[in-house]
Amino acid sequence: MKKTIMASSLAVALGVTGYAASTGHEAHAAEMNVDQAHLVDLAHNHQDQLNAAPIKDGAYDIHFVKDGFQYNFTSNGTTWSWSYEAANGQTAGFSNVAGADYTTSYNQGSNVQSVSYNAQSSNSNVEAVSAPTYHNYSTSTTSSSVRLSNGNTAGATGSSAAQIMAQRTGVSASTWAAIIARESNGQVNAYNPSGASGLFQTMPGWGPTNTVDQQINAAVKAYKAQGLSAWGF
């Protein structure tokens, strides 16, 4: 899935790679004597700092590849954005700052997700898709939802998928909802650079995951072959 970011103040300058045109020149990190290791650390571990302030004063357009990821940092001097994506083009994380309101839409046919921002406020919005964290967890359940101790949930789509999985496998819907919450936080388009994707984070060998139905089918195949051990149970 390729993601694009569009902000009202960057609509002309920002394209599918997330670059903003500031001086007409896209500067590689080496050209600006940028500490790539520091920027990589910020993108993965300190996203709040990237959202709070630009990495330097004035306009800039920095992009570089490191350890299998493409990193982009742009600013027009007023608003700024940053992103990083796996080498295969799957966006791992991005943010466009100085936008208070945003809407998201997903085109299932073209596998493109767009985020439109209203850049009239200093508030920031962040959307990120990252590899799932595996740990011991506890769940609280209602008739239609599961919430893990870390706050992850299966979401509306994930809860529906869990019900279908229960019908097709005989395993309780709450168990499947917990798996979905842990693996993807209910994000249909969740992607792990390892290749796992979808609500259930199944590997490509179990089948395509472009749609929720395909994700359910892939999860059923994985379950029939490996049982719940496919998800570490």
From Swiss-Prot:
The keyword Isomerase does not apply. It comes from the Bacteria. GO terms for cellular component: extracellular region. Residues 1-29 form the signal peptide. It is found in: Secreted. This is Probable transglycosylase IsaA. It holds the Pfam family SLT. Keywords: Glycosidase, Hydrolase, Secreted, Signal. InterPro entries: Lysozyme-like_dom_sf, Transglycosylase_SLT_dom_1. Gene3D superfamilies: 1.10.530.10. Belongs to the transglycosylase family. IsaA subfamily. It comes from Staphylococcus aureus (strain bovine RF122 / ET3-1). Its EC number is 3.2.-.-. Is able to cleave peptidoglycan. Transmembrane segments: none annotated.
